[in-house]
A protein has these predicted regions:
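Conserved MFS/SLC helix-loop-helix module at the cytosolic interface between two early adjacent transmembrane helices
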Residues: 55-92
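Helix-to-loop junctions at the C-terminal end of transmembrane segments
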Residues: 56-69, 163, 264-282, 371
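Cytoplasmic helix-loop-helix junction between adjacent transmembrane helices
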Residues: 106-148
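Helix-loop boundary and gating motifs at the non-cytosolic
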Residues: 2-52, 214-257
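Transmembrane alpha-helices of Major Facilitator/SLC transporters
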Residues: 53-55, 252-277, 293-296
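C-terminal ends and interior cores of transmembrane alpha-helices
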Residues: 78-96, 291-307
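Hydrophobic core of transmembrane alpha-helices in multi-pass small-molecule transporters
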Residues: 15, 83, 96-117, 311-327
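C-terminal transmembrane helical hairpin of 12-TM major facilitator-type secondary transporters
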Residues: 282-332
Length: 409
């Protein structure tokens, strides 16, 4: 019962963090777009955020294994509060270069915060589900991932609304205060021992020695790179500059998209028939859904290129893309926990989400470059190429896992 209570506390803290993270992303994007930043310059604002995610997940997995989930979770919340306060001191009289460096630093802190919090919440699931209960594990992973994205979408909307009503500075102060209260409450309720490994992990163990986890991590790099290469900068800027949408419209639309995407993730287990061993059917479904996602992305790219009812094509295409991507993401998030041992779950999850952050970093960088060079179509072509690579590696998971099982017999 105590484990369940701890899981609820960790999840609630992560939900609160996610709401501010989504709002901050939209605040920064919209605020600096109004200041005249180019698509590539907007992308650079998030580069350190994503880069720090790569490093944080590696080290955070080791910290969680050695010192417990409480330390990593509270550290993440505290760093996000600090990041929000720092950004509120941004001065329009500063030079462009100094302002950029200042925002990069604050965003870097936020990137560390986000991945410490996420790694903590994902690891906590494995600690409360019995080893053989694969179906429950999948459902809890899907529920957490889906609710996280739904709240991030709500955060996008919140960011747009706060920017319109309160302005940049007061919006940041409001979020920092709310998150600080959540930090105090979580510190009071959580025991220090949650998530500590019985064996003291060495720092070199942050790199996975498991072939299936390595392959899944590579697939994750390209899967999330494909999403962010057109979603982070290209799509919002296209909606603002080409379709002349307002800030509220862009924030609201992206919020609804992510909320819908999160809802689909939550219900993904109902679309997948569970296998007794927890992976055989799931691996086949993962490959099939990757192929479907590639076809959907190809259709969107062709529709935008030939200018076939651009707004409608984009709206329906985004709905289909979000649905397929949500199922793929939920499957991959489940598989990493299925492949992990309970005693080193934070190490495995940390390594895997380091790959996830690397994909977002690559996608964020390419989003600004591709859009500036070739527009939305160019960003979609890059996304499709990355999805094809992710599909190939996903298809390699089955043979890799079978070889591992054969060696253990």
């Amino acid at each position: 019962m105590t484990n369940i209570r701890n899981y609820i506390v960790v999840t609630a803290a992560y939900w609160g963090f996610t709401l501010t993270d989504g709002a901050l992303r939209m605040l920064v994007l919209l605020h600096f777009h109004t200041l005249g930043y180019s698509p590539f310059e907007l992308a650079t604002l998030f580069l350190l955020y994503e880069l720090m995610g790569v490093l944080t997940n590696l080290i955070g997995g080791w910290l969680g294994s050695r010192f417990g989930v409480k330390l990593t979770l509270l550290s993440g919340l505290a760093l996000q509060v600090l990041s929000l306060f720092l950004l509120s001191f941004l001065n329009p009289l500063w030079s462009a270069i100094f302002s950029l460096v200042f925002v990069l630093f604050a965003q870097g802190l936020s990137g560390v915060a986000k991945d410490l919090s996420k790694m903590s919440s994902k690891s906590a699931i494995k600690l409360v589900v019995p080893k053989s209960n694969h179906s429950t594990l999948f459902k809890l992973v899907a529920l957490l991932t889906g609710s996280k994205n739904a709240l991030k979408g709500a955060g996008f909307f919140l960011g747009g609304v706060l920017l319109s009503i309160c302005g940049f500075v007061y919006a940041l102060w409001f979020m920092a205060g709310a998150l600080f209260a959540l930090l105090i409450l979580s510190g009071w309720l959580l025991p220090s021992s949650i998530g500590k490994s019985s064996a003291k992990a060495k720092i070199r163990e942050v790199f996975s020695k498991s072939r299936p986890i390595n392959i899944l991590s590579i697939a994750r790099v390209f899967l999330f790179g494909a999403r962010d290469v057109w979603f982070v900068v290209a799509l919002p800027v296209f909606l603002l500059s080409e379709l002349n949408w307002s800030f509220k419209a862009v924030g609201g639309f992206l919020a609804l998209w992510i909320i819908g995407y999160g809802i689909v993730q939550s219900f993904a287990p109902t679309l997948i028939k569970s296998s007794e061993d927890g992976h055989s059917k799931e691996l086949k479904y993962a490959s099939a859904w990757m192929v479907i996602l590639c076809l959907v992305t190809l259709a969107i790219t062709l529709a935008i290129e030939v200018e076939y009812h651009i707004t409608l094509s984009l709206l329906f295409g985004l709905a289909a893309f979000g649905f397929c991507f949500a199922v793929n993401s939920a499957l991959h998030s489940y598989l990493i926990l299925n492949f992990s041992n309970v005693d080193n779950v934070t190490l495995s999850v940390g390594f895997y989400y380091s790959a996830n952050a690397a994909g977002r970093l690559l996608g964020t960088l390419l989003s600004g470059i591709a859009y500036q060079i070739a527009g939305l179509t160019g960003a979609l072509v890059v996304a499709l190429s990355m999805l094809i690579i992710a599909t190939v590696f996903t298809m390699l998971l089955g043979p890799a896992f079978n070889r591992v099982e054969a060696n253990q017999i």
